[in-house]
């Protein structure tokens, strides 16, 4: 008997078959490098840098950039950015550089070259006859890499947000040590012609390489990071949110997770803390794993750990944090239940609201204030109607312990208290809610209950 088969009847005929499903080609992929090989891309033949500069600049002025030529130029231009490595630099067992070595972005990765010549057209006319200076090369590299940042800005940002960022970036790359090489608004005009460049693997790879280099190596032209900084922890919003959350509540990751009272957290916590990843290693390839092509589907994104993401931002909303109110709810990950847990944790860790006395004349005054607040909360618990007098002993100890918080939720039937709902409504109703945001969810869900 085949253990994989099932037997059943169709029109009195016995059928035996093995149920098979489509193999998921998009499984989460962890970024750890196990073969000691650096991240790698293949580009066309290395160009003459002066010719390439003139071609790419003329393409920028005409808003007609060839992505292959741009990538080939960016890889070749790495030679202009040499700095000293401050410490031995290793990641996933790969030695990138030794302390004191003079390095460019090149040793971080492997760039293979073919014999295929680039296009190197002069679409915008031939304006520059002399050879460009290093600062002109640096300015062009900075402007090109900024196209990555601009293409990552989502359509949710309203008004002139993107134009304002493009203008500020242009100002950076026309101020010393850089030099003005394009007219005002050229960057935004060019971006419109290549708005999806963040999806081009080689361009994304080079943006991540430059960012990894400038985040570690002090350099005259470090401001180039203004265009590449979005490659750091890209598609890691779940893990980044969790990290920010534990810093806020001043607990270790282990202590914080004890408050995650929901069965759907189990898979996500396991996913987020898979062993063998360099999540806590500074300047690791992990930080830029998405742009360097080490993972096709991030296990650390908001969608990959949606329950954790929802909970953290509901707690953030309870605190009135704009970032949380603006974040997008992961609708498939129990937002109602997460909002309940978020209300209780928000109250436990952040008090009844934003306004509290935080500063005192001396230690004695601080202790007196804390003692008075403790008495107040004991009275509130006794009068709440949700706590029986039998439970007073239970609450007189560590009221913030996971056991105490869990018991409180259970005693309220897994529902929010009126005070929680009032808090949620007050923070969300004063906020201009974006579509599908946490603010909109709280407004729609709780505004009638307050």
Curated annotation (Swiss-Prot):
The modification Phosphoserine is found at residue 389. Phosphorylated by host CK2. Unphosphorylated protein N seems to have a better affinity for leader viral promoter encapsidation. Phosphorylation of protein N in ribonucleocapsid may stabilize the interaction with protein P, thereby playing an important role in viral transcription/replication. Disulfide bonds: none annotated. It comes from the Viruses. Its main location: virion. It is found in: Virion; Host cytoplasm. One of its GO terms (cellular component) is ribonucleoprotein complex. Gene3D superfamilies: Nucleoprotein, Rhabdovirus nucleocapsid protein like domain. One of its GO terms (molecular function) is RNA binding. Keywords: Capsid protein, Helical capsid protein, Host cytoplasm, Phosphoprotein, Ribonucleoprotein, RNA-binding, Superantigen, Viral nucleoprotein, Virion. Homomultimerizes to form the nucleocapsid. Binds to viral genomic RNA. In nucleocapsid, binds protein P and thereby positions the polymerase on the template. Protein P acts as a chaperone on free protein N to prevent it from aggregation before encapsidating genomic RNA. Belongs to the lyssavirus nucleocapsid protein family. Displays a superantigen activity in human and mouse, activating mostly V-beta-8 subtypes of T-cell receptor. Encapsidates the genome in a ratio of one protein N per nine ribonucleotides, protecting it from nucleases. If expressed without protein P it binds non-specifically RNA and therefore can bind it's own mRNA. Interaction with protein P abolishes any non-specific RNA binding, and prevents phosphorylation. The soluble N-P complex encapsidates specifically the genomic RNA, with protein N protecting the genome like a pearl necklace. The encapsidated genomic RNA is termed the nucleocapsid (NC) and serves as template for viral transcription and replication. This is Nucleoprotein.
